[in-house]
Amino acid sequence: MGKTLKEIIRILEHAGDVKAYALIGGLAVGGWIAPRATRDIDILADLSVTTRSAIEEVLKKLITAGFKGSLEIGGPEDDIKFCIKVVSGENVPVDIIFASRKWEAEIVEEGMVVEVLKGLSIPLVRPEGLVVLKLKAGSFQDVADASKLLVEAEYDLQRLRNLAKRARVDKRLERLMEKLGLT
């Protein structure tokens, strides 16, 4: 996984339209609290101009580097508008989701560089942003990750509540915090 992550970082660092990027999946959760097993890499990226052609340029760079995959385009009602889904030569699945809302761009740009694998540092979305993204996604694992972050990580509660409101998961957040005895 380390080789794949290094290559992804190299490509994103040299992709002209990429303003910022940060890990958002299990690796990111493990950067803030006790790591959990994960087999994939999830990244949220912010482009200077979020267009299909700019995203296709990133995909071309990945394919040239030996990744296999495609660009998935969401519909108007989908939370995810553009997502590159690729698999590395190491057989590691990678999802690169592109920010389509202002709050998403903000949490990427506010990412903090953390060592996630020995000798390998990358920006991570801060705990407040991760909790909101996990509540947006809503799977069992996502809610479990959000719960662990709420209980174990250090975060700014007011910032978390503001982000949750902007992402329209504020009621979900309050219910989860109540269930966890955090209110």
Write out the residue ranges for each language-model feature.
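Compositionally biased terminal segments of proteins
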Residues: 1-183
